[in-house]
A protein has these predicted regions:
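Exposed beta-sheet edge and beta->alpha loop/turn motif
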Residues: 82, 188-227, 232-236
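Short, surface-exposed charged micro-motifs
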Residues: 180-181, 211-213, 265-266
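Core segments of small alpha/beta cavity-forming domains
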Residues: 2-45, 55, 86-168, 244-283, ...
Length: 293
């Protein structure tokens, strides 16, 4: 849960709101640090106020278990956190090549909570979308006619059950979803899942992100909001022109692109990557971008 990325400079804590770590009544927080073959010299942590002006607690030279790929760190926080208040967790990692790498996450004390129940619900709903269980997802959708029912690139809680369960497209999930909490309160859990699927009929792959907002009660869990964004994963060398037009396939939004003066090369950004398409050579090229971190 909650993938975090390292920074080599101090960051503004108030803006580091990509994810939230919830602390249960045992005050334990487990962290797994992927080493990427780095030689790690020390690990320390701080819990600060969101504006970073006040140090709540900290610890140096943390003990860790090394399994070869990950360094596993377990924090037992002091009983200093106020329930419902947000703090900033800063994990500091010193390596042989880099003096200090910092990882940031919002931290909130939940005490007794039902976050795992909400996660289980989201995973069940997610499985229903993949297995084509239209009747199952229909129980939680709020169809109101605002969605056209044809676009698989973007669907939400107001969509019909057909598009939510991928319509006629046969999909298989690749690997496990990456889960991130974006909001944690006493009875509210908001999370995202990111994963890839394959269209098994035409062997195309798609990057998918789902967002859930859930409310737990003693009798049931309510799906308050649901969205899904799907984008075809582009591959260098693939042809994009169909009937003289660029065809990007399933996309969550229309790509923005620019042409050169001769109008024979098109550049566009898709999924954080810069691509170019040469009409003359009918060839797609990745100009700049990162994948898998």
């Amino acid at each position: 849960y909650n993938e975090m990325h390292g920074y080599v400079e101090d960051m503004d804590g108030a803006s580091m709101r990509d994810s939230v770590i919830g602390v249960s009544e045992d005050h334990k927080v487990g962290l797994a640090l992927e080493k990427y073959n780095a030689q790690i010299k020390s690990v320390s942590y701080e819990v600060r106020s969101l504006d970073m002006s006040r140090l709540i607690e900290g610890g140096d030279d943390l003990q860790a278990e090394d399994d070869g790929k990950y360094l596993h760190v377990s924090l037992t926080l002091k009983d200093l956190l106020t329930q419902g208040e947000e703090y900033l967790l800063v994990l500091k990692v010193q390596t042989e090549d880099q003096d200090l790498v910092r990882f940031y996450s919002i931290l909130t004390y939940l005490g007794t909570n039902h976050v795992q129940d909400c996660v289980d619900f989201a995973q069940r709903f997610h499985e229903m979308t993949l297995t084509g269980d239209s009747d199952g997802v229909l129980n939680y959708l709020e169809q109101d006619g605002s969605m056209d029912g044809k676009n698989l690139g973007y669907i939400n809680i107001h969509s019909r059950s057909g598009p939510v369960t991928w319509g006629d497209m046969q999909v298989e999930q690749i690997g496990d979803p990456s889960l991130r909490f974006t909001e944690l309160e006493s009875d509210i859990t908001a999370l995202t899942m990111e994963y890839q699927v394959t269209n098994t009929e035409i062997n195309e792959q798609y990057q998918v992100r789902e967002a859930y907002r859930l409310r737990y009660t003693s009798t049931r869990i309510y799906l308050l909001a649901y969205e899904r964004w799907t984008d075809k994963i582009l591959e260098p060398g693939r042809q994009l022109v169909e009937d003289g037009k660029l065809s990007f396939g399933i996309q969550s939004s229309e790509p923005v692109y620019m042409k050169n003066t001769e109008e024979n090369v098109v550049g566009f950004v898709e999924q954080g990557q810069l691509w170019s398409y040469d009409y003359g050579q009918n060839r797609l090229s990745l100009v700049y971008g990162f994948t898998d971190g």
